[in-house]
């Protein structure tokens, strides 16, 4: 019976890690889709799914990351600090690019948001 519980826990952790990876790629894809639309002058805000799904995906990405962090009991390691810093940069750059207050968004903020996000993904992959 103990083996079954351990095996199920292991499967749950593996599923959580795969969900985290899925949400990372989904968040990146949604960033690129909204960014491309914004750069081409398309109103992505008129598409309800593109207004809601990025927030949901990013939230589930962060929550799954925190749960993984708790389950694996990571200390404060360099790669974790770097991922957190890149996550903050991604949020700042994306917020500047997608701000409603700016009539003509600067594409550099979009590219910096993409680089920050991909950098965080690469750190996770290469650590």
Curated annotation (Swiss-Prot):
GO terms for cellular component: plasma membrane. It is a multi-pass membrane protein. Pfam families: SirB (PF04247). Keywords: Cell inner membrane, Cell membrane, Membrane, Transmembrane, Transmembrane helix. Its main location: membrane. InterPro entries: SirB (IPR007360). It is found in: Cell inner membrane. It comes from the Bacteria. The chain crosses the membrane at residues 13-33, 61-81, 82-102, 107-127. Belongs to the SirB2 family. This is Protein HI_1253.
